[in-house]
A protein has these predicted regions:
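Conserved, well-structured core segments that form or line functional sites
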Residues: 103, 112-205, 209-211
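Ligand-binding loop in jelly-roll beta-barrel domains
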Residues: 99-126, 206-208, 215-246
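Short acidic-glycine-tyrosine-enriched beta hairpin
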Residues: 80-98, 186, 201-225
């Protein structure tokens, strides 16, 4: 059994444009100094927001990785050298940049907006030989199902339109009512959870917004909450079938 918990204070930090964009990074770059390093086929995970006015990160290149942006609040605008135009995205929307053999993009985060940017490793020995592609998906494209105690939004999984090449990835977002909860965990997989709002009582400790959980070799994730909360989940293989970039270093 393995449950690792990383509060905001244990995560790497970042910023752009003199603090116009701020970040906590559950999984940072090697030079960022956070406690958690890349694992599974997850290479990077940043929670970024604008505390005030909108701000733009200028054109910059990417290769190999699949870069997914999830709009948690507000709006963003995206530009890349394949689309050659600005594309707006709103709360609940998702974009996928399969950066392949190279693409450059710019991103504008609107005032008081918030995103995840997560890099997946699709097997760089293959992806670096492929052309870059782009897709975005609207919030209404994703299925929301009710269950006892809340709802689950399937972002990547059965019946989801979202597609990535990185193997065996599932992504969900839970909206949970107050009470006791138990989430079934998959054998051979790593479940990564991020508290989007509210608090969790786990093993007699309280964890709040921004806390990150990495869990594997456990049948169920059991916890209590006093009131409504939101929980973001990525399920990924404990041992990918290929050597990841992080394992090559």
């Amino acid at each position: 059994m393995s449950v690792e918990i990383f509060t905001k204070e244990q995560q790497a930090r970042g910023s752009f444009n003199n603090g116009e964009i701020l970040e906590y990074k559950p999984i940072g770059f090697p030079q960022d100094g956070g406690f958690l390093k890349p694992y599974s086929n997850l290479f990077y995970w940043a929670h970024a927001w604008t505390p005030g006015e909108k701000s733009t990160i200028g054109l910059h290149p990417h290769q190999g990785f699949e870069i997914c942006s999830f709009v948690l609040k507000g709006k963003i605008n995206h530009f890349d050298t394949k689309q050659n135009k600005w594309i707006p995205l709103s709360e609940g929307d998702v974009q996928v940049i399969r950066s392949g053999n190279g693409i450059s993009h710019a991103e504008e985060i609107d005032a008081e907006s918030e995103i995840f940017q997560i890099w997946f490793d699709p097997n760089l020995s293959v992806s670096l030989k492929e052309d870059a592609t782009y897709n975005d998906y609207k919030s209404d494209d994703f299925t929301i199902n009710d269950f006892s105690g809340g709802t689950i939004k399937t972002i990547l999984g059965v019946d989801s339109p979202m597609k990535i090449k990185t193997e065996n990835i599932l992504i969900n977002c839970y909206s949970l009512d107050g009470g006791t909860h138990s989430i079934n965990l998959k054998n051979g997989m790593v479940h990564s959870f991020f508290i989007l709002s509210g608090e969790i009582n786990f093993n007699h400790n309280i964890y709040d917004l921004g806390t990150f959980f990495k869990i594997n070799d456990l049948e169920k994730f059991k916890f209590n909450i006093d009131k409504e909360m939101k929980l973001f989940e990525i399920i990924s293989p404990k041992n990918p079938s290929y050597k990841t970039y992080a394992n090559m270093r």
